[in-house]
Amino acid sequence: MDLPKAYDPKSVEPKWAEKWAKNPFVANPKSGKPPFVIFMPPPNVTGSLHMGHALDNSLQDALIRYKRMRGFEAVWLPGTDHAGIATQVVVERLLLKEGKTRHDLGREKFLERVWQWKEESGGTILKQLKRLGASADWSREAFTMDEKRSRAVRYAFSRYYHEGLAYRAPRLVNWCPRCETTLSDLEVETEPTPGKLYTLRYEVEGGGFIAIATVRPETVFADQAIAVHPEDERYRHLIGKRARIPLTEVWIPILADPAVEKDFGTGALKVTPAHDPLDYEIGERHGLEPVSVINLEGRMEGERVPEALRGLDRFEARRKAVELFREAGHLVKEEDYTIALATCSRCGTPIEYAIFPQWWLRMKPLAEEVLKGLRRGDIAFVPERWKKVNIDWLENVKDWNISRQLWWGHQIPAWYCEDCQAVNVPKPERYLEDPTSCEACGSPRLKRDEDVFDTWFSSALWPLSTLGWPEETEDLKAFYPGDVLVTGYDILFLWVSRMEVSGYHFMGERPFKTVLLHGLVLDEKGQKMSKSKGNVIDPLEMVERYGADALRFALTYLATGGQDIRLDLRWLEMARNFANKLYNAARFVLLSREGFQAKEDTPTLADRFMRSRLSQGVEEITALYEALDLAQAAREVYELVWSEFCDWYLEAAKPALKAGNAHTLRTLEEVLAVLLKLLHPMMPFLTSELYQALTGKEELALEAWPEPGGRDEEAERAFEALKQAVTAVRALKAEAGLPPAQEVRVYLEGETAPVGENLEVFRFLARADLLPERPAKALVKAMPRVTARMPLEGLLDVEEWRRRQEKRLKELLALAERSQRKLASPGFREKAPKEVVEAEEARLRENLEQAERIREALSQIG
């Protein structure tokens, strides 16, 4: 046997990771096997592995390895995303260290630098996934800006444009002054932030004033109206009149609109269509022309803006404007107020709103195609509740702003004629050809749109483009649609719904059959991990400390029902201990083979029990894999390995091995081989190493998945009675304060025949022998099918034992009384954190239960 005494993941995992990376599991579209396809959510090319990636890919790899062993042509398509904003920001920061900006380089040179960075650093995360054991088809690795994916993007846009679904129009958009690009609503994060609410008064035409409340006084100069609720009696007499914008000579109408909240502020709303989404909608209804006073750099500009504010940053302008309003008598009051601050999800800068032309995708007609499919059950969701969430979003979807003012990304294939201003987009049949003259007027003076597509535009094509679409490739014919999409619920709208749109529109069917949505990985307190909080758990550090198998197993074990995961390092310790337990069990089996001399070949009760339980386990665990309930599958295999195999069967097998029973050795080997197969999808490194040592076969990943055998219910029932007898004896020893190895004598009642028929096994496991008669005084432990009685005479000083128990009983009752007083205090329950109250309640229950057990033991001894 060549297994070292102790398991060290560092000596095992890297060699297998290297082997799988060098010899990837390449899919064959012509194999004739049923396909099973997973599209890997492409991580950002800028990224390093975080816990979300580790969870996501652990689940995907478990499914792909399971299906590969089930005989499917298992295809896991990997790749990375060009991550427009994120990548551009990374390279801009590198330039900043050189004292340069992207504008100093110009677009062409800047893009050369980005590609250079991508080639040097962009493969980091895929290398890290390989270290985690990801058995993807690395020969099919894709990048959202490589040649094939770029063709897909151009073709999709050409189709959308010529079908009237892609159009260019000026609209109010989210704008990041730092990243200098528009953002979709899904790329904007809103956080409650301490701020101020300012009440300002406007002079009303004909005399008097009207007061409004705002958190953005610097935008007053862009007001185009004051709106009040039509049913607000306070202001009904002012509707139709005009008010003057403070510090200006601009008069604006006072109008009625039902969108106004009567109970907010003064009940009157300043309407600033160019700088607020609600105001933009009100302006659209009332025909108000938007006026902007903040430019794309976030600075004040425009004729309406007082000279003292022009050119100032918007936040500096806010402070200065408040001073001017105060001095002029327009500031009624200033109060603390929690504002919903909208920020760029990439850089954290507070966003601005701006109106200028953008490319949009009409989502309503596209969503209808998806909704029909979802309503007829085309796509299953796990957990099922997310299906309704998906449908609700699609039913209320708005047009998608698909253009971004970046340099890194897919440049939009649209050209503008400098003579007649016509838009030129290549037709689908010539989608790769750049136009040389205007289709409308024939002019050769064409200028290409400088914007790029939103990163999610290319990501939305991922299930198609990874298979070679729009070409009719063998992969596309064989592997579309995919089977399972595994991803976090946080990108359901950003990505999953948009892939559904692409699939139904371009392929006429669903892009995948099932969507498995998992939760976020949080810290042990349930907080989102972030560098600023200092609570980030680095998966690579965990791999170094516990092993990749332990990390994978812990995350899978915790991924229940799509809920967020609170990751405590104790779970990683649990998984590492599990790996060690399995390793030691395998070493025992391998050691048992050395020098073994067969003297008999008879199935023991323990052999029959283990084979029967294994058959049941195979059936249940297979069903859980099929149901995509990987967390429960992990728990079932953990119980089967740790409890049934290691704790019970291995121990029960030792007397038979000592007696030279070949059937028992064979059972050990066969059961271990099956357990390694069941666990392989979740713990591929250790199981591969042990399977090779056990069987001499090179690649467990290519072995067949086990099939359930027959059940032996008689053996299971008999062995359960034996287990209960052993458990009862062990419990009695613990109650009496005796060491587990202490030899004792007990009297058994109930279903005792299995003990009598397997006396050697009972004696070995329980370290006990049987009394022929029931003792008068004894400690008693009742189990469902067996009751054990153990007299204390001859084992210990009964009176001393009694004194110790009575003393402990008093201590427990005192502790319980203290807990009861604390829990009865209204102040404690109201002020203490929920987890503190729950811990105190648990302490009370435990102390009362222990006290009751001691009372019972004392009454038994008499």
From Swiss-Prot:
Any Pfam family matching the protein: Anticodon_1
Major site of localization recorded for this protein: cytoplasm
Stored Gene3D superfamilies: 3.30.1170.10, HUPs, Isoleucyl-tRNA Synthetase, Domain 1, Valyl-tRNA synthetase, C-terminal domain, Valyl/Leucyl/Isoleucyl-tRNA synthetase, editing domain
Gene Ontology MF terms in the entry: aminoacyl-tRNA deacylase activity; ATP binding; metal ion binding; valine-tRNA ligase activity
Cell inner membrane in keyword set: no
InterPro entries in the record: aa-tRNA-synth_I_CS, aa-tRNA-synth_Ia, Anticodon_Ia_Val, M/V/L/I-tRNA-synth_anticd-bd, Rossmann-like_a/b/a_fold, tRNA-bd_arm, tRNAsynth_Ia_anticodon-bd, Val-tRNA_synth_C_sf
Catalytic activity, EC: 6.1.1.9
Highest rank taxon of the organism: Bacteria
The reaction(s) this protein catalyses: tRNA(Val) + L-valine + ATP = L-valyl-tRNA(Val) + AMP + diphosphate
Motif window: 'HIGH' region: 43-53
Annotated compartments: Cytoplasm
Motif 'KMSKS' region, residue range(s) on this chain: 528-532
Protein family per UniProt: Belongs to the class-I aminoacyl-tRNA synthetase family. ValS type 1 subfamily.
Subunit structure: Monomer.
Name this protein carries in UniProt: Valine--tRNA ligase
Name of the coding gene: valS
